[in-house]
Structures are given as C-alpha cells and as structure tokens.
Amino acid sequence: MSMAISIRSSTRPVEVRRLGTVEYLDAWELQRGLVDARVAGGSDALLLLQHPSVYTAGKRTEPHERPADGTPVVDTDRGGKITWHGPGQLVGYPIVGLAEPLDVVNFVRRIEEALIAVCTGLGLDAGRVEGRSGVWLPGDGLRPERKIGAIGIRVSRGTTLHGFALNCDCDLSAFSAIVPCGIADAGVTSLTAELGRRVTVDEVTDAVAARVCDALDGRLAVSGVSVDTYASGVASTQ
C-alpha cells in the first residue's frame, strides 16, 4: 500500500473527541462501543484524553516487568508490554476502520510519524529506533536513548483500538516501578524534560490531532527505518 494514500476504508473525516480526564476502564469500554459502531457503518474517531494514574499491561508483558511492590495493573488485550498512564500524558485512541488489505505495520508507522512531526515542530530531534516501537530521542555521551511516545494497538474486525501516549509534563518517576514497554536499557522522557520548559497536554493536543489525521490520510509522508521487526509486538489482532 502506498504511503501517499489513506489507510482508512472510509472517506468521511475522522471525528476528533477531546475528552479531558477519563478513567482507564471507562475509556476502554468507550473504545469497544465505538468499534461496534464503526463496524456497523459509523465514522472513524480519534479520542484524545488523559488518565488518572494507572499501569496497563499488554499481552507480551513478563512477570518481572510488573511493579515489584504489588501495585495493581490493568491487563489489556492490546499489543506491547507494560506502561504507565497518568496526568500530564496525552493519550490517543484512534478507532479506525482499516482499508483492505489490512496493513498493521503501515498503521503503526503512520502514528509514529505523526508524533515525530509534533516533537520536531517543538524543536526536538525525535525519530525511531530500529527494532523498538514508539518515538525516541537519540542517546548521547551523557544519556541513553529516551522514549517520549509509546504505541500499543489492537485490531478487531478490521478496526483499530488502543493507541498511543505522548509524555508532556507527566511525573516520570511513575515509570521507575516497572520496566516500561519491556525495555530495560533505555530511558523515558517528556517534552517538558527535554525542552526545559513546561509543555502541557493542552499545548500539543491540536497539533497531535492534526498530524494523526494527516498521517492516516496520507498527507504526512512516512520516513525512517522499517518497523517490520517489531510491528507484531505492538499490535494484537483478532
């Protein structure tokens, strides 16, 4: 499938919904309802929100990656491993009917490209790391590679759910209780930590909405390394 065309099966605009702060389980229930509606002929949607502090585990999470102190974790049906969501992190859930033939790798790359474009627009040298999902800042002599955006999705009946998270001004210490995304030899960062000024969720929400829609519809070209080696790890299909 050419990157110059839409990955969506619908030509109707994506309905962007800014929901504020939503409990994780409530958002998951909303996603499932929107998938049912999309399969029945409804519109694609992009949910943009924040969660109260919560750990969620994808289907590939190993026992040693969970909090050692027994902190509760919500087990999900998405791809990927364990991560944290909470205040100061923008979470996006694209509920999108994919065009045939289904190309999950293409979908993941487009979401990554959208987040890379947002980070680049703020002056950061963001990109991909081969063999690892998400959006990263390169390592240097003082710091390792640092993940600023995470992706974990599910495809059910040809429709995506779950999605991505972009660290804006969240409390990064929340990641210290886990092995985030199963990666022990790299760091986690935020827009605020990298730019040296507070970057709120509200500041980037419009840009994220625009870039995600651009990427899904082919208006934002995808570049960078192939994600074939890890796409199966961040996506779960049914």
Curated annotation (Swiss-Prot):
Its EC number is 2.3.1.181. The active site is at residue 181. GO terms for cellular component: cytoplasm. InterPro entries: aa-tRNA-synth_II/BPL/LPL (IPR045864), BPL_LPL_catalytic (IPR004143), Octanoyltransferase (IPR000544), Octanoyltransferase_CS (IPR020605). It is an enzyme of class 2 (transferase). The record marks 147 as: Lowers pKa of active site Cys. Substrate binds at residues 78-85, 150-152, 163-165. Residues 40-220 form the BPL/LPL catalytic domain. Keywords: Acyltransferase, Cytoplasm, Transferase. GO terms for biological process: protein modification process. It catalyses: octanoyl-[ACP] + L-lysyl-[protein] = N(6)-octanoyl-L-lysyl-[protein] + holo-[ACP] + H(+). In the reaction, the free carboxyl group of octanoic acid is attached via an amide linkage to the epsilon-amino group of a specific lysine residue of lipoyl domains of lipoate-dependent enzymes. Catalyzes the transfer of endogenously produced octanoic acid from octanoyl-acyl-carrier-protein onto the lipoyl domains of lipoate-dependent enzymes. Lipoyl-ACP can also act as a substrate although octanoyl-ACP is likely to be the physiological substrate. This is Octanoyltransferase. It comes from Mycobacterium sp. (strain KMS).
